[in-house]
């Protein structure tokens, strides 16, 4: 097969992969334009545009001069095309990009210790886990504000442990932020779309808690925040 023939074959493989994964494109949009609009493929915008232009030139023009191909497609572009095909066929998953080295707390952890960890790590939300590594709730600065609002400043002591805040840890009860579970095998682009939305109460999604199947009763494997996936 000629060089241009190999290139066209790869283009068709990519187009088939896009159709298989996404069910095709809308409004007759080319696979290359379609992919360039997706966050996952933003780093490949230049390559996708070039591939599209070269493909159209070869497909719709006579590229032979005196019976020989007048266009040479370099392996650099071929390799980029193969890489994009690989990403479409084997998409990056939540498990690939989530943070697994977590800063966590247990019910017996002193609050002062947790706050020091938050300052040192710049994490604003700390997962509180039980002895099996399952999520009990999320501790944040708003957890403290909520307790003060409910119980008064006199309720706070230097000896406080996370258990003293147990009534305010439930992920459903945070006022400003929401939290969801997600399976580690879910495509990362779905996580991106989730972070762009607000829930029915207008709360932003602050964290995705990653488990094997997205089940709250499973061990926490990692977390994902908007800063991990959004530019």
Predicted regions and their residues:
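Amphipathic alpha-helical interface elements
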Residues: 1-53, 60-97, 106-123, 128-131, ...
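Short, local alpha-helical segments
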Residues: 37-39, 174-178
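A structure-centric signal for secondary-structure junctions around beta-strands
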Residues: 45, 176, 204-205
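Short, low-complexity disordered segments enriched in Ser/Pro/Gly and basic
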Residues: 95-99, 173-176
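The conserved cystathionine-beta-synthase
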Residues: 104-122, 129-130, 148, 180-213, ...
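Active-site-adjacent beta-strand anchor residues
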Residues: 138, 181, 218
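A conserved mid-domain beta-alpha-beta active-site/ligand-binding segment of alpha/beta enzyme cores
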Residues: 164-169, 178-182
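Terminal recognition/anchoring or ligand-binding modules at protein termini
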Residues: 210-219, 223
